[in-house]
Amino acid sequence: MKKFTIYLAGDSTVQSYKTPVKPITGWGQMLHTYFKETEQKMNQDGCDWMGYGKKSDSDFDQSIIYETDGMFIDNRAMAGRSSRSYFDEGRLDDLKKAIKSGDYLFMQFAHNDANKEKEERYVTPEQYEEYLLRYINAAKERDAQPVLVTAIAMRDCDDTPDGKFSVSFPEYRDKMLEIGDKYDIPVIDLGKATDDYLNTVGDEGSKKLFMWLEKGAYEGYPDGKQDNAHLQQAGAKAFAGLLAGLIRSYDRDDKLDKVKAELA
């Protein structure tokens, strides 16, 4: 049977990373590890910093494709992109050239959409719907299945009165849930799942998931780092696992059944 492809569109929290930025890792870089895998060929041209995947046929160099037993995961997410700037740069047009009948388009945006200081990225929640519909319609026009993924939670416990984590970009999450209901599109509420998970691991535990790095621990970050938005490998692995679990438990309809069947 011909393999289908899951395409990922999103931002830095989804992106696959190459050297020398280790250990920053997007959840899209680890998602393949939760599916039935064929034996991986390592260190192919364009692979990620762990040696997995290879350059996809995208016109954009950061895109990396992973092969599993029954499908491909083509990660076309890119740091700093919102639903607006991703579209404006022609990245959706590039994706449209590849996506075909039976494929999936998973999209996670909000981190950059909510940034009012970056005019080229910012969209209001109402505009967010307009842009997401462009992705949804692009998939549907090619008989592919669009899937909405709410944005992962940030490490915001230092900024809340009770030291608890909260759902990030709630207006955009609410709008995405509304879009899912309105247009009958599957929604994977990764934002809520990651918020719940972070409240379980707590303040100190969350530092091992995000880019909190000691000085000298990594060549690319000699001065260390305290980054509450981006994930290191352990965080990307955990969050990808939450996404896989949400796919497995999805029961609103049968639109994700083909993906479920490939989970390990």
PLM regions and their residue ranges:
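Alpha-helix initiation/capping motif
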Residues: 2-5, 26, 82, 170-171, ...
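Glycine-centered flexibility motif
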Residues: 10, 16-18, 26, 80, ...
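Short, acidic Gly/Pro/Ser/Thr-rich loop/turn segments
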Residues: 14-15, 83, 114, 195
